[in-house]
From Swiss-Prot:
Subunit structure: Part of the 30S ribosomal subunit. Contacts proteins S4 and S8.
Region span, Disordered: 1-50
Family: Belongs to the universal ribosomal protein uS5 family.
Lineage: Bacteria, Bacillati, Actinomycetota, Actinomycetes, Micrococcales
Function: With S4 and S12 plays an important role in translational accuracy.
Gene3D superfamilies recorded: 3.30.160.20, 3.30.230.10
Name of the protein this chain belongs to: Small ribosomal subunit protein uS5
Domain S5 DRBM: 53-116
This protein's record includes keyword rRNA-binding: yes
A GO cellular component annotation in the UniProt record: small ribosomal subunit
Record keyword rRNA-binding present: yes
Gene for this chain: rpsE
Written domain comment of the UniProt record: The N-terminal domain interacts with the head of the 30S subunit; the C-terminal domain interacts with the body and contacts protein S4. The interaction surface between S4 and S5 is involved in control of translational fidelity.
Biased composition (Basic residues): 32-41
Length: 225
């Protein structure tokens, strides 16, 4: 039997420990790099899918729930999402953290998309929408007017791609009611082409004349330039 001295045993144990530590470190770095690649690819996918839409956070509210052990805080977010070209939706998200509440609101808004009829950059006719005690009036405007509206109404109209419009809030100033009243107004808009077919009229007899003149003047000036 060959006996090893204490120094040889200690050197061998140190070598084994260092080898194990090197192996575990390499495995940990490999797992970390794999997680990093997965996270980066997931973030790139989210950014590419969200890059096609406009997102506006209208309101963030903190809610407290009183329980036996104290108070539990959560957040709610009202979010407007649209493609800026006639499609818009509104969602409401709730979570324990603000970013998660906003992401839930975005997903909810995408499930509620609908199409907004437009004439050039404005709406085809005056319309009024109501939601609870909120009342919003929308009127067509000539090209170049811009969005004459407050914060909640402006967020909905910009995401819907309406760039020239006049608006007035006649009821509650609560942002949630105002947003849903604006949505109700947009949902009551009718496509001028379908109205003209139903009435047996020409398209330009349905659209307001001042809007037609303004659109024609803008087109003529662009052709001249």
């Amino acid at each position: 039997m060959v006996r090893q001295s204490g120094s040889e045993l200690s050197d061998q144990s140190d070598t084994d420990i260092s080898a194990d530590s090197d192996t575990s470190a390499s495995q940990g770095s490999a797992r970390h790099s794999a997680r990093g690649r997965h996270r980066d690819s997931r973030q790139k996918g989210d950014s590419s899918s969200r890059g096609q839409f406009l997102e506006r956070v209208v309101r963030i509210n903190r809610v407290a729930k009183v329980v036996k052990g104290g108070r539990k805080f959560s957040f709610s977010a009202l979010v407007v999402v649209g493609d800026g070209d006639g499609t818009v939706g509104v969602g409401y998200g709730k979570a324990r953290e603000v970013p998660l509440a906003i992401s839930k609101g975005i997903e909810s808004a995408r499930k509620n998309f609908f199409t907004v009829p437009r004439v050039a950059s404005t709406i085809p006719h005056p319309v009024q929408g109501e939601a609870a005690s909120g009342v919003v009036l929308l009127r067509p405007a000539a090209p170049g007017t811009g969005v004459i509206a407050g914060g909640p109404v402006r967020a909905v109209l910009e995401c819907a791609g309406v760039r020239d419009v006049l608006s007035k809030s006649l009821g509650s100033s609560n942002s949630i009611n105002v947003v849903y009243a604006t949505l109700d107004a947009l949902k009551h808009l009718e496509d001028p082409a379908s109205v003209a077919r139903r009435r047996g009229l020409d398209y330009y007899h349905v659209v307001p004349k001042r809007i037609v003149r303004a659109v024609n003047s803008v087109g003529a000036s662009s052709d001249t330039a």
